[in-house]
Design a protein with these regions (language model features):
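Short beta-strand/loop motif that positions the catalytic acidic residue
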Residues: 122-124
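Short, proline-enriched alpha-helix->beta-strand connector loops that line the catalytic pocket
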Residues: 115-120, 147-149
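Gly/Ala-rich beta-loop-alpha elbow adjacent to hydrolase catalytic centers
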Residues: 79-83, 87
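Alpha/beta-hydrolase fold nucleophile elbow
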Residues: 71-80
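Serine-hydrolase catalytic machinery in alpha/beta-hydrolase-like enzymes
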Residues: 2-72, 161-166
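A conserved short beta-strand
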Residues: 96-106
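Acidic catalytic loop of the alpha/beta-hydrolase fold
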Residues: 127-132
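C-terminal catalytic histidine-bearing segment of alpha/beta-hydrolase fold enzymes
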Residues: 149-189
Length: 189
């Protein structure tokens, strides 16, 4: 089974994140959930995003690197919203990356370098106001041009964190399909 590094959203490492991690662990995966906010959590996205901006993206990436330092090779990076941006960064640059799962975030505004042999799977609600049209397609094209599998899925509605069972955005039908697809992705490793 996979070693999954699961990175939280701008809300921080909440009970919802722990529930999601448990779901992957019950499927047999070794799941690590680094707290890149050092214990801070938020009830809404805006203050969480403000905190991330105050800390700085490069510092958050460094915290992920530090948390993964002793985990060995063959890591799958997954993340939710802000955590998807961190997972994407690790998948793009960490030589131990074997796969990337992006939930409710990710993408690039222009073509970029992607590691060969690091497949990526992304999940968004079609009318999510946090999704910038075209950026996920650019990431998929960049990964495919690197010779790796790249796929993304769109779900009905406008909910952002629709797979987090503790948020008002939660949509059980879409979340179940997302987890089914993500678990099938993890079974490849």
């Amino acid at each position: 089974m996979s070693t999954l590094i699961l990175l939280h959203s701008a809300l921080g490492r909440t009970s919802g994140m722990d529930a999601v991690a448990e779901r992957f662990a019950l499927a047999g995966h070794a799941v690590h959930t680094p707290d890149v906010y050092a214990g801070k959590t938020f009830d809404a996205a805006e203050p969480g995003v403000a905190h991330a901006q105050e800390v700085g993206f490069s510092t958050l990436v460094d915290r992920v690197k530090d948390a993964c330092e002793d985990l060995g090779d063959d890591l799958v990076f997954g993340g939710f919203s802000l955590g998807a941006a961190l997972a994407q960064q690790m998948g793009k640059n960490d030589p131990r990356a074997r796969g990337v799962l992006l939930f409710h975030g990710g993408g690039f505004p222009k073509p970029t370098r992607w590691q060969a042999g690091v497949p990526v799977q992304a999940h968004f609600a079609v009318d999510d106001s946090w999704r910038t049209p075209g950026t996920i397609e650019t990431l998929m094209e960049s990964a495919a041009k690197a010779g790796t599998q790249a796929e993304y899925f769109l779900y009905p509605g406008d909910s952002h964190l629709f797979s987090d069972p503790t948020t008002p955005d939660y949509r059980e039908d879409s979340a179940e399909l997302l987890y089914e697809r993500a678990l099938a992705f993890l079974d490849r490793f």
